[in-house]
Every structure is written in structure tokens, then in C-alpha cells.
């Protein structure tokens, strides 16, 4: 008989609180997935001491529990410019490992907002647009130094194909030079550039209908728009080839300017922020120990009923119990509904 009494003792589990280490005798046990159990009074945020229960989102990191607000504040991804976190509906701009709000994705020198398709340099002290980067580079390297990969070989403004015109050539020579045909560039304003770049970021090869819409929106001629897209595609292709060659020659090569490290990049389209949390929220379950279930059932039902006797046998888990899965299911249908979910894991009273 002594051997027959051992198996039930082995099956009984003792719930220990992760917070205080003591055994849990409370009416309710808070379980943090997958197998952490707490007193209701011990499950609190490690920062603000807010009590956590099944109605809250709980995060566990390095053995400490946090509410959602404090976890995002401490460990969530923040904007590299304003150091403010992101909501799940925010669109963000990325530059290597740094993430920015769309409004914060600006040149630190001129405060111009960078849009998809813009060229910029990522340095230790922030983002620099192409123009300001070249100004600092020329001042640092001097006018006689050879052009670096980031130096423009043409005007910084995005220019379309020039149209023909006649004007006298001004040369500082003593002898008079004859007039000749020169090419005048069509300089685009900021609004026109923004429209063209936005369209290019969405589709580098627009169809005829889209080009007609761009003509109406920008006031430029179809030929200017067509050539602008051709030049832009050619320029991006050359830059891509150049960057690949530089990466192959010197994988860790970066442009060092006045002690600052600048990495040439091209702004991509904004993307939705996915939260960036380094841990997933865990579920907190509240359940009653089996002894509490038996007590409530005994107060509301006749203890001589077969269902109650079967529930007692199932809780004891003795070897003489013949309860099956179907009998347990039939017993559960006779139990009164309770506001809390019950977990069928036995606990030592």
C-alpha cells in the first residue's frame, strides 16, 4: 500500500513565486508564459512598480518584468535625430542601422528634408545632403585635390537636357573670338525636382501617360522630362557600379572628412515601423488552484453527485482512479462558469 501512495505525491506540483521565492497559497496565481508563476502582489513592473495582470502586456528581460510603456522607453528603437520612440503606425526612414522619423530625416547643415532618391552622407554627427557634404569636403581637401567618389563632376542641381541658344562666348583673350553656339542648362526649381524625384522613386521608367501628367504638374516640356529620367537612370547606374568597385577594393573604406566618417548613401522610400522590440510580449494568465475549484463546486452542488466524486478522484490522481479523458470532459460541462480561466495543473494546498 505504501508503494501505491507514492505516485500521487510525485505528480503534485508546488508553485513557487518567481518574485519572492515563497510558495504560492493565494486564491489566484499569475502565470507568465511559459512557466513563470507569481503572487498577484509580486508581479510588478521593475521601473514604475505598476501591478501587472492578465489585462496588461508584460515583457520579461534579464529576469525582470516590465510594462509595455517602460519596456519601449528603455529598450525600444528610437529616432537617431530626436531620440523619441516610434508608434506601430509610423513610417520611418533608414540609414544603415539608424532609424529616423520622416520629419527628422534632414540635413544637419541646411535642414532640408531628404526625400527618396536624394543622395546624402551618413556621418558621426548626422546626415548631410550632397551639396553640404561637397562643401565640407572641398574645404577640407582643398581645391587642387583630386575629386573623391562623392565629388560631383557636374553641377549639383539636377538638370535636364539643355536646349540650344546663341550667346557670345566670353573668354579673357586679347584676340576677339567668333560667336559660337553654346548649350544652356534648364535649371529646375525645388518643386519640380521634388515631383520628378518622387515619381522616379516610384517608377524609374514612367510610361507615356505618366509623362503627360508630369508635363502638366511641372510645366516642363516632354523632351526635358524624358531626358531627365534618362540622365537620372544613367547617373544611378554609374554610381552603383562605382560603389561596388569601392566595396570590392576596400570593404571597410569610408570617406574621412575633418575627423568625421561619412558613408555615401541614397535615400530609400519610407517604410512602416514594425515596433522594433527585441522581445515579444508574454501572456499573463490568472487561474484558480484545483482546491479552490473543488471548494466552490462543493458549496454550489450536492457532494453526493457522481460528478463531484469523479472530480475528487481526478484531483487526487490515485492509481485506483479510472477517470478517462471523456469523463473529464463530461464533468467540465457540469461545472459552473467562472470569470477566470482554469489551468488543470495540480498544486499543493
UniProtKB/Swiss-Prot annotation:
GO cellular component terms listed in the entry, alphabetical order: chromatin; nucleus
Annotated compartments: Nucleus
Gene3D superfamilies registered for this protein in UniProt: Cysteine Rich Protein (2.10.110.10), Homeodomain-like (1.10.10.60)
Domain LIM zinc-binding span(s) in chain numbering: 17-70, 79-133
Record keywords: Activator, Developmental protein, Differentiation, DNA-binding, Homeobox, LIM domain, Metal-binding, Nucleus, Repeat, Transcription, Transcription regulation, Zinc
Gene Ontology BP term (one): cell population proliferation
Residue ranges of the region described as Disordered: 312-349
Organism: Gallus gallus
Feature: DNA-binding region: 181-240
Pfam families assigned: Homeodomain, LIM
Disulfide bonds: none
SUPFAM superfamilies: Glucocorticoid receptor-like (DNA-binding domain), Homeodomain-like
Function: Acts as a transcriptional regulator. Recognizes and binds to the consensus octamer binding site 5'-ATAATTAA-3' in promoter of target genes. Plays a fundamental role in the gene regulatory network essential for retinal ganglion cell (RGC) differentiation. Binds to insulin gene enhancer sequences. Defines subclasses of motoneurons that segregate into columns in the spinal cord and select distinct axon pathways. Acts in conjunction with LHX1, LHX3 and ISL2. Binds to insulin gene enhancer sequences. Essential for heart development.
Record protein name field: Insulin gene enhancer protein ISL-1
A GO molecular-function descriptor: DNA-binding transcription factor activity, RNA polymerase II-specific
Biased composition (Polar residues): 321-343
Keyword set includes Metal-binding: yes
Family annotation (InterPro entries): HD, Homeobox_CS, Homeodomain-like_sf, ISL1/2-like, ISL1/2-like_LIM1, Znf_LIM
CDD domains, alphabetized: homeodomain, LIM1_Isl, LIM2_Isl
Amino acid at each position: 500500500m505504501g508503494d501505491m501512495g507514492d505516485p500521487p505525491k510525485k505528480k503534485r506540483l508546488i508553485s513557487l513565486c518567481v518574485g519572492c521565492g515563497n510558495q504560492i497559497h493565494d486564491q489566484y496565481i499569475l502565470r507568465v508564459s511559459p512557466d513563470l508563476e507569481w503572487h498577484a502582489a509580486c508581479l510588478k513592473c521593475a521601473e514604475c512598480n505598476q501591478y501587472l495582470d492578465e489585462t496588461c502586456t508584460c515583457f520579461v528581460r534579464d529576469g525582470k518584468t516590465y510594462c509595455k510603456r517602460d519596456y519601449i522607453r528603455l529598450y525600444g528603437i528610437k529616432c537617431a535625430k530626436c531620440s523619441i520612440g516610434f508608434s506601430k503606425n509610423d513610417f520611418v526612414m533608414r540609414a544603415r542601422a539608424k532609424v529616423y522619423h520622416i520629419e527628422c530625416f534632414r540635413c544637419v547643415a541646411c535642414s532640408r528634408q531628404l526625400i527618396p532618391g536624394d543622395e546624402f552622407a551618413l556621418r558621426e554627427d548626422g546626415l548631410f545632403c550632397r551639396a553640404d557634404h561637397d562643401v565640407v569636403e572641398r574645404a577640407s581637401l582643398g581645391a587642387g585635390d583630386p575629386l573623391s567618389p562623392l565629388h560631383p563632376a557636374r553641377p549639383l542641381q539636377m538638370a535636364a537636357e539643355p536646349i540650344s541658344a546663341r550667346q557670345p562666348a566670353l573668354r579673357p583673350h586679347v584676340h576677339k573670338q567668333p560667336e559660337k553656339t553654346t548649350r544652356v542648362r534648364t535649371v529646375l526649381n525645388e518643386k519640380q525636382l521634388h515631383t520628378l524625384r518622387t515619381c522616379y522613386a516610384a517608377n524609374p521608367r514612367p510610361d507615356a501617360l505618366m509623362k503627360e501628367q508630369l508635363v502638366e504638374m511641372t510645366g516642363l516640356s516632354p523632351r526635358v522630362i524624358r531626358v531627365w529620367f534618362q540622365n537620372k537612370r544613367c547617373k544611378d547606374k554609374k554610381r552603383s557600379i562605382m560603389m561596388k568597385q569601392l566595396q570590392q577594393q576596400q570593404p571597410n573604406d569610408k570617406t574621412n572628412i575633418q575627423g568625421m566618417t561619412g558613408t555615401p548613401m541614397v535615400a530609400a522610400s519610407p517604410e512602416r515601423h514594425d515596433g522594433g522590440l527585441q522581445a515579444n510580449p508574454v501572456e499573463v494568465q490568472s487561474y484558480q488552484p484545483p482546491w479552490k475549484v473543488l471548494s466552490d463546486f462543493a458549496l454550489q452542488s450536492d457532494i453526493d453527485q457522481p460528478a463531484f466524486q469523479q472530480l475528487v478522484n481526478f484531483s487526487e490522481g490515485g492509481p485506483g482512479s479510472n477517470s478517462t479523458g471523456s469523463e473529464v470532459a463530461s464533468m467540465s460541462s457540469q461545472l459552473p462558469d467562472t470569470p477566470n480561466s482554469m489551468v488543470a495543473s495540480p498544486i499543493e494546498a
